[in-house]
């Protein structure tokens, strides 16, 4: 919104021209989301404690987690609020891609909020019934997928970018909608599964968002997109502002979520952040790149699928506990060691993903 205001004020003072620069708005978007998150943190934590909205800890989980009982949850509210305000302030409101991401962010946030509310307020350990959770996730994802398809039909915006191959960019047609659906819903639930230790999910989210910010900048620039042999997508550049807002809000949340956590993000945060990352990757035509950069989320999800599948088919478990971060805890790794090592792996995967843009 401030961009529009600056465009009207530039005739009175040329300094307002700085608002037209994407790099400037990306930086202030990060800082705005960061400061908002840091400001809201203590207030939200105190409010959640007053309402006794605390994390539910599984009795069959690692014993070290029992001390987490009573820690406030639903801290994702500060993340979503910070991102939304920052994006509305610094992104061009006429950009349809920005609204697509915000729609998924807020929509999945509402689904996660209802799930958390049922768990911690109504004391329903199952939360939102699984079929209803997937139903609303699907409705939101399909609504955005069809909208994005209508905006970019038969353009590079609906092509598929394949890592390592510069000349393979097939036009997906309606398959675009199906792919977008699975990426958005899948990433949302993958981040949700990863959110099991203090700071474990938020830092890989920050790393991936930072990586996608660089990709968005290149994808929205015709010269760089041509140089890297990736699809040039007309509205993609403005997603840099969205990505940096996620980075800022995530770092602000980490201030309170680092071990030992003062607050957990809850499903309201993890479902929304995962959905937003998936949506951004689809808009940038970098679904395969997200698979690489978000490798930690992928492995966490696969560990659950393999564990459940193995137990149903063979009656045996592959891991001591799934998702896989609990497996390492039960092997005797201290929680901070698991967290930091997963962070390091996540950073490496983001860098490898970015390198694939050039290795073609």
From Swiss-Prot:
Q: What is this enzyme's EC?
A: 2.7.8.13
What topology in the membrane does the UniProt record assign? Multi-pass membrane protein
Gene Ontology CC annotations of this record: plasma membrane
Its top-level enzyme class, in one word, is transferase
UniProt keyword Chaperone present:
no
Any GO BP annotation: peptidoglycan biosynthetic process
Which GO terms of the molecular function aspect are on file? Answer: metal ion binding; phospho-N-acetylmuramoyl-pentapeptide-transferase activity; UDP-N-acetylmuramoyl-L-alanyl-D-glutamyl-meso-2,6-diaminopimelyl-D-alanyl-D-alanine:undecaprenyl-phosphate transferase activity
What the record says about family reads: Belongs to the glycosyltransferase 4 family. MraY subfamily.
Q: What is this protein called?
A: Phospho-N-acetylmuramoyl-pentapeptide-transferase
Q: Give the gene that encodes this protein.
A: mraY
């Amino acid at each position: 919104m401030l961009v529009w205001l600056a465009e009207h004020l530039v005739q009175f003072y040329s300094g307002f021209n700085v608002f037209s620069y994407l790099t400037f708005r990306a930086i202030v978007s990060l800082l705005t989301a960061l400061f908002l998150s840091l400001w809201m943190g203590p207030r939200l934590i105190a409010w959640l404690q007053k309402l006794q909205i605390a994390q539910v800890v599984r009795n069959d989980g690692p014993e070290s987690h029992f001390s987490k009982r009573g820690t406030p949850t639903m801290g994702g509210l500060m993340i979503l609020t910070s991102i939304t305000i920052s994006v509305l302030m610094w992104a061009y409101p006429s950009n349809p891609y920005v609204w697509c991401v915000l729609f998924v962010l807020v929509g999945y946030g509402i689904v996660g909020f209802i799930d958390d509310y049922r768990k911690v307020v109504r004391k329903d350990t199952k939360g939102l019934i699984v079929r209803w959770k997937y139903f609303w996730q699907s409705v939101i994802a399909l609504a955005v997928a069809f909208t994005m398809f209508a905006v970019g039909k038969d353009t590079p915006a609906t092509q598929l970018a394949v890592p390592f191959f510069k000349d393979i960019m097939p036009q997906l047609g309606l398959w675009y909608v199906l792919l977008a659906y699975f990426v958005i819903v899948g990433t949302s639930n993958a981040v949700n599964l990863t959110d099991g230790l203090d700071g474990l999910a938020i830092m890989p989210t920050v790393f991936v968002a930072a990586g996608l910010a660089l990709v968005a900048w290149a994808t929205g620039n015709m010269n760089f997109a041509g140089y890297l042999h990736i699809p040039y997508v007309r509205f993609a550049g403005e997603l840099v502002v969205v990505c940096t807002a996620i980075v800022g809000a995530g770092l602000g949340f980490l201030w309170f979520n680092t071990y030992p956590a003062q607050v957990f993000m809850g499903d309201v945060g993890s479902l929304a952040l995962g959905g937003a990352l998936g949506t951004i990757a689809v808009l940038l035509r970098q679904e395969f790149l997200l698979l690489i950069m978000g490798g930690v989320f992928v492995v966490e999800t696969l560990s659950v699928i393999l564990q459940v599948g193995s137990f149903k088919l063979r009656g045996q478990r592959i891991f001591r506990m799934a998702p896989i971060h609990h497996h390492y805890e039960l092997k005797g790794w201290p929680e901070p060691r698991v967290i930091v090592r997963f962070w390091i792996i996540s950073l490496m995967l983001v860098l490898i993903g970015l390198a694939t843009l050039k290795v073609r």
